[in-house]
Amino acid sequence: MYGRPQAEMEQEAGELSRWQAAHQAAQDNENSAPILNMSSSSGSSGVHTSWNQGLPSIQHFPHSAEMLGSPLVSVEAPGQNVNEGGPQFSMPLPERGMSYCPQATLTPSRMIYCQRMSPPQQEMTIFSGPQLMPVGEPNIPRVARPFGGNLRMPPNGLPVSASTGIPIMSHTGNPPVPYPGLSTVPSDETLLGPTVPSTEAQAVLPSMAQMLPPQDAHDLGMPPAESQSLLVLGSQDSLVSQPDSQEGPFLPEQPGPAPQTVEKNSRPQEGTGRRGSSEARPYCCNYENCGKAYTKRSHLVSHQRKHTGERPYSCNWESCSWSFFRSDELRRHMRVHTRYRPYKCDQCSREFMRSDHLKQHQKTHRPGPSDPQANNNNGEQDSPPAAGP
C-alpha cells in the first residue's frame, strides 16, 4: 500500500476537478456513454463487444494476423474533435503467439491513466468516473468493472485513489485469467459488477499472481476467498455483488492417504498367561469327557493308563503286590520297604520320605495366632504318614 500526505492528495484532487470543469462543455455535447471496444485476434475468429447506453451487442468478425507486435500504448490529445469519439487508446498485447488489441474510445471529459510495463508484461488502464476497465484474453469472457472516485498516478506507476491513497490494481507479467463463475451474456442482458463509492475506494481487482493457477501439480487450489464473483442481471439498473467471503467453485479434494490398519494378534502369547492353553499343551487326551492336555507325550501316555487301567510298574519286594502307573511312584514306594527318609527336619531331627510331608511337619513348629505355646512339644505326637502308594 502506498500513502501520500493529505495536502498532496487534496492538491491533485483539485487539479482533476479543474481539468474536468474545462471539458464540461464537450461532455454536454456528447450524449452517449463511453464506448469500450475490445477485440482479440487469434488468427481464426474473434469477438467485438461494445458498451453504450443502450443494450450491449456482440458481433463476430474475422481477425487479422498482422496485429502481432510488441505492446504499444498510445493516447491521443484530448483536444481533438468531439464527433470523432474522443481520445483513442490502443493496447496490443501478444500472448502465446497471438495478438489482441483492446481499444477504449473515450470522450475528452474522461481521465485516462496508463501504465506501461516491460514487453513481457501487460498494460492496465483505469479511468476516473463511471468508466470501464478492460481485462481480456483471447476466447475468454471480458470483465467490466465500473469504478468511481478521484484517481492519481504516483511515480511508481500504480494508480492510487486520491481520497484514501490505496492502490487500485496490481498485476504481474503473467497472463490474466477470468474470475470463477463469469459467463458471457446475451444481447438483452448486461454484465454488471460491484461499484466502489468514492468515499471508500478499495482494490477492485486482486493481484494476477493470486488469480493464476498454481504451478505445482499437487496444489489444485482455486483463487483465495477474497476473489469476487459477478452476477448477470436482466435489468441495467441493478447492481448486485456476491459476498467477498465466497470461495471459488469446484475445489478439488486432495486424495488422502489410505488409513493404515494395524492388525493386532488377538491370540495370547504362547507360554504366557494360563498354562492350560491348547498352544502351550499340544498333547490332549482324546477320551470322552476328559479334555486334559500335557506338554510332553510321556505325560499323556501315563495319563491314558488311568483310562485303560494298565499298571506296568510293579513292586518286586517280597510279599508286596503293589503296582503303579509311573516309575517315580514305584521308587517312592520302595522307600517304605528300605526305610530310606531323605527329608529331615532341622528343628526336631525327624525324617520323612517325601518333601511334602516335611513341609507339612514344619508348620507345627510355627506359633499359632491364638496359642503361641501350642504345638511346641508335640514332636512325639506327630507320627509319620502311613506308607502307601
UniProtKB/Swiss-Prot annotation:
Any one biological process term the GO annotation gives = regulation of transcription by RNA polymerase II
Stretches of Polar residues bias are at 26-38, 372-381
Outline what the protein does: Transcription repressor that binds to the promoter of target genes and prevents their expression. Acts as a negative regulator of epithelial-mesenchymal transition and metastasis in breast cancer. Specifically binds the 5'-CACCC-3' sequence in the promoter of ID1, a key metastasis regulator in breast cancer, and repress its expression. May be a germ cell-specific transcription factor that plays important roles in spermatid differentiation and oocyte development.
- What's in the keyword line of the UniProt record? Activator, DNA-binding, Metal-binding, Nucleus, Repeat, Repressor, Transcription, Transcription regulation, Zinc, Zinc-finger
Q: What cellular component GO annotations does this protein have?
A: chromatin; nucleus
Intracellular or extracellular location(s) = Nucleus
Q: Is Membrane one of the keywords?
A: no
InterPro entries listed in its UniProt record: Znf_C2H2_sf, Znf_C2H2_type
Q: Which domain of life is it from?
A: Eukaryota
* SMART domains on file: ZnF_C2H2
MF terms from GO for this chain are:
DNA-binding transcription factor activity; DNA-binding transcription factor activity, RNA polymerase II-specific; RNA polymerase II cis-regulatory region sequence-specific DNA binding; sequence-specific double-stranded DNA binding; transcription cis-regulatory region binding; zinc ion binding
Q: Which family does it belong to?
A: Belongs to the Sp1 C2H2-type zinc-finger protein family.
UniProt-annotated stretches for the region Disordered: 1-48, 239-279, 356-389
Where are stretches of biased composition, namely Basic and acidic residues? 264-278
Q: Identify the CDD domains for this entry.
A: KLF17_N
The entry's protein name is Krueppel-like factor 17
Q: Name one Pfam family in it.
A: zf-C2H2
Q: Where are the zinc fingers (C2H2-type)?
A: 283-307, 313-337, 343-365
